[in-house]
């Protein structure tokens, strides 16, 4: 029996939850999120790696599987239909999840037992009127903050409910920001469109070093949206949060750099505006850590329509080069306007953009007479900032408004 347990960890690991318990009970943490819309109430939670092992008796995270617990209460009389693709467009089916659990022992026929065990823990798709259904959807692993939709349809009705659920394991940079302490109430002010254009044109041209003595990359983006809409818009577009710089993230970065592999949450260096490092940073990894898009945002004291106004910088890493100051550094694409426009397209295709326009910024620098950033990389630009009005609801690309700041009165 001991030998069997050593060979069959999938079945012999201590499982504190039966399949029925898994369906009915959320993961053992205090990170549940609840949202009510119309006649449905949805509760979600994401199990950490350790909690997943406790619930399922297996290290699912090592197989890139992250269980998301969902409970949907249908408070109406008509049946509703849950669409799991909103949680993850590439989610794993229950049988696929069970198959991955069995890959380590391909010669033993564990199909029937494991399939039933995992399948019985799954969230159903139909929620009858006046009933409640719960269970797990098996998604790809996201760390830091997991962002997803719960999409439910019924007769002539549709519910789209965004969720942001924290997942332990990373030290995310913006978790340390005290948003209420950034500015005294007396400095915060709501402005008109005309005043917004003037105020943005008077903002600093560029990021600086810590002492504020040397200019770096141009501040070429402005984002208007509350904290949740800002996070959700970028994460829905496939951008990841970044870790703080500490031993764990440095080691992960080093391993990724040496192997050329992807590290989605790699720290970004501190750049400064308003005398402080970025409030939040996002990145979109490509084929390796050497190739990524990253952006930094600083909240300003301005509000437009009651929403926070952020100023920021976006650039595209296209390689790594050696420097005297930092030994190695990322090399940016000098066409910073192309990267700026990529962000417009990216948010538009993610249905996160309500409108956009342009204001003056750093001023033009042409191909033959470029400026330089803090690490000596050249860049050229038309000198403008794009102003992005985020949408809290999915916005069709054909309905995005072009804001004429030149005609703002």
Where is each model-derived feature located?
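Surface-exposed edge beta-strand/loop patches
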Residues: 15-19, 90, 121-187
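A cross-kingdom signal targeting lumenal/periplasmic-facing segments of multi-pass membrane
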Residues: 66, 73, 247-407
């Amino acid at each position: 029996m001991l030998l069997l347990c050593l060979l069959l960890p999938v079945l012999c690991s201590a499982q504190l939850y039966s399949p029925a318990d898994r369906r009915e009970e959320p993961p053992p943490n205090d990170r549940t999120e609840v949202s009510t819309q119309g006649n449905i109430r949805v509760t979600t939670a994401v199990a950490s790696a350790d909690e997943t092992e406790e619930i399922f008796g297996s290290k699912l995270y090592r197989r890139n599987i992250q269980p998301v617990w969902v409970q949907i209460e249908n408070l109406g009389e008509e049946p509703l239909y849950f669409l799991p693709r909103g949680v993850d467009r590439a989610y794993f089916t229950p049988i696929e999840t069970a198959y991955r659990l069995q890959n380590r022992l391909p010669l033993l026929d564990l199909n029937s037992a494991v399939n039933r065990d995992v399948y019985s823990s799954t969230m159903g798709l139909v929620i009858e009127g006046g009933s409640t259904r719960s269970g797990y959807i098996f998604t790809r692993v996201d760390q830091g903050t997991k962002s997803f939709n719960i999409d439910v349809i019924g007769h002539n009705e549709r519910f789209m409910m965004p969720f942001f659920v924290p997942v332990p394991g990373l030290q995310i940079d913006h978790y340390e920001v005290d948003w209420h302490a950034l500015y005294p109430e007396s400095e915060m002010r709501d402005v008109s469109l005309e005043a917004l254009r003037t105020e943005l044109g008077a903002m600093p041209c560029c990021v600086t070093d810590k002492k504020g003595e040397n200019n770096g990359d141009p501040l070429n983006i402005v984002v208007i949206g509350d904290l949740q809409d800002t996070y959700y818009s970028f994460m829905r577009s496939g951008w990841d949060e970044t870790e703080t710089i500490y031993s764990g993230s440095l080691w992960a970065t080093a391993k990724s750099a040496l192997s050329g592999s992807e590290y989605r949450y790699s720290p970004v260096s501190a750049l400064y505006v308003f005398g402080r490092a970025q409030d939040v940073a996002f990145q979109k990894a490509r084929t390796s850590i050497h190739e990524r898009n990253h952006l930094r945002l600083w909240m300003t004291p301005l509000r437009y329509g009651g929403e926070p106004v952020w100023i920021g910088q976006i650039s595209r890493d296209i390689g790594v080069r050696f420097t005297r100051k930092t030994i190695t550094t990322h090399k940016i694409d000098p066409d910073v306007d192309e990267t700026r426009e990529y962000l417009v397209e990216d948010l538009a295709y993610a249905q996160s953009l309500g409108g956009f326009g342009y204001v003056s910024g750093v001023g033009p620098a042409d191909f033959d007479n470029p400026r330089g950033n803090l690490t000596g990389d050249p860049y050229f630009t038309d000198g403008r900032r794009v102003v992005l009005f985020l949408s809290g609801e999915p916005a069709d690309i054909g309905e995005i408004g072009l804001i004429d700041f030149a005609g703002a009165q």
